[in-house]
Regions:
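Metal-ion/cofactor- or nucleotide/acyl-coenzyme-handling active-site neighborhoods
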Residues: 1-166
Length: 166
């Protein structure tokens, strides 16, 4: 069976590296589009952009819509970031985000340094952007007859109806 690999449009020249008859390479614009709803819908429909992509979920869901799927089921999308945040006695934001894999020491250090550079309101603003993008995706998907179901127990994402993978 064949497979479609989606890559950012900025990397389209690298698509030649994937010379395989079972692999179709398609591109998408990794550009945040914001404005009037009709404008956003037009840009999304032409694949010119998407709601602000704060993480891999936004482009993944948008890719599913662009590829014509009528039902998109989210698994492992707990987004429990809020419960991982604290501020230490030096007023540094600390976030310990558990993953199903073990972070190596370099990655843990990188994450610590990343959060220390930002005050809490900036971290929360970034999270709010992600959750706002999910609500925009839900509205766009519904207007296209696409159902997005969140099948992740305990998920903090409130934009998509809860459901089962079935």
């Amino acid at each position: 069976f064949g497979m479609t690999l989606l890559i950012p449009a900025a990397c389209r020249r690298r698509a030649r590296l994937f010379d395989n008859p079972m692999l179709k390479v398609d591109t998408f614009n990794f550009v945040a589009v914001e404005g009037f709803g009709w404008f956003e819908d037009a840009m999304f429909g032409m694949r010119r952009g998407m709601p602000r992509p704060r993480n891999v979920m936004v482009p993944s869901i948008m890719a599913g819509i662009w590829l014509g799927y009528k039902r998109i089921c989210l698994l492992g999308a707990d987004h429990s970031w809020l419960s991982t945040l604290t501020v230490n006695d030096r007023n540094e934001v600390v976030s310990v985000q558990p993953h199903f894999y073990k972070e190596d020491e370099r990655e843990e250090k990188r994450i610590r340094q990343e959060y220390v550079r930002h005050p809490l309101h900036e971290v929360l603003d970034s999270m709010a952007i992600a959750f706002r993008s999910y609500h925009r995706l839900q509205a766009y998907a519904a207007s296209r007859g696409v159902s997005i179901v969140n099948a992740t127990p305990g998920s903090m994402i409130d934009a998509f109806p809860r459901g089962e993978i079935s």
